[in-house]
Amino acid sequence: MKRIGVLTSGGDSPGMNAAVRAVVRKAIYHDVEVYGIYNGYSGLISGKIEKLELGSVGDIIHRGGTKLYTARCPEFKTVEGREKGIENLKKLGIEGLVVIGGDGSYMGAKKLTEHGFPCVGVPGTIDNDIPGTDFTIGFDTALNTVIDAIDKIRDTATSHERTYVIEVMGRHAGDIALWAGLAGGAESILIPEADYDMQEIIGRLKRGHDRGKKHSIIIVAEGVGSGVEFGKRIEEETNLETRVSVLGHIQRGGSPSASDRVLASRLGAYAVELLLKGKGGRCVGIQNNKLVDHDIIEILESKHTVEPNMYQLSKELSI
């Protein structure tokens, strides 16, 4: 394999640039040319593809977002769209592709593999919801962004003796809410993977208030429901002054943490190794601090789960 491509797809995550950098440098180290596909699968179809050199990835390891940009691409879900993308790759002599993104990006890589084009997936999403890896690129940075927000909100919650509901990202996965809630000392954590009892939460808030507790923090993953609605209900049923903060897309931005930079570098380089060994249709990950790879179809058919012991711990510590 003498030429490979790399693209970022789906929602951006801090550390994607570090992964792109690792792909380019690892490939060039092995005398393999690298082409960057801009705007994800959309750029693959439109032919927005450029050769990347060492200088192309200079000064990006510490930058959030993605140098290659990203976009949603409904057209790629069609056979015609995928065939057009493969045609553009073959015109340039590109023989393999590294795809950095979440499960939607993995689905695109799977489809390309089924068309006979070798792809390797690299998990890049703040949600940490990709099976087969302990952590995804961007999760640690997003987690630290949320924890920083919790700490600051707690300062004002304490000053005004208020209850705060903080809504975080996580439409289908509660990792951000769970980890940030544990690290931030939240009184209640609501995640999509676990049922909750609203009356139990309200009772806990009332008991805390009765014993002199001046403020409370409740973390709600967006997949559970609207933080605004939770805030209204809590205030109505407890008579405690309640405010809501929806963190939104700030969770996706920012300079990647040291952990995410290292993870992205390891996974990006490993993806190139797999392609050069002729191993397409795979996706990479980290488990117990060791690099692993899995069949991409198996991963797409698997379901990510949160650590049940961590969720139980969060309940035990929030009494």
Swiss-Prot record:
Keywords assigned: Allosteric enzyme, ATP-binding, Cytoplasm, Glycolysis, Kinase, Magnesium, Metal-binding, Nucleotide-binding, Transferase
Superkingdom field: Bacteria
UniProt GO MF annotations: 6-phosphofructokinase activity; AMP binding; ATP binding; fructose-6-phosphate binding; identical protein binding; metal ion binding; monosaccharide binding
Chain positions recorded as Mg(2+) binding sites: 103
Catalytic activity as recorded in UniProt: beta-D-fructose 6-phosphate + ATP = beta-D-fructose 1,6-bisphosphate + ADP + H(+)
The UniProt record lists the keyword Ribonucleoprotein: no
Required co-factors: Mg(2+)
Residue numbers annotated as active site: 127
Gene Ontology biological-process annotations: canonical glycolysis; fructose 1,6-bisphosphate metabolic process; fructose 6-phosphate metabolic process
Function: Catalyzes the phosphorylation of D-fructose 6-phosphate to fructose 1,6-bisphosphate by ATP, the first committing step of glycolysis.
Subunit and interaction comment: Homotetramer.
UniProt protein name: ATP-dependent 6-phosphofructokinase
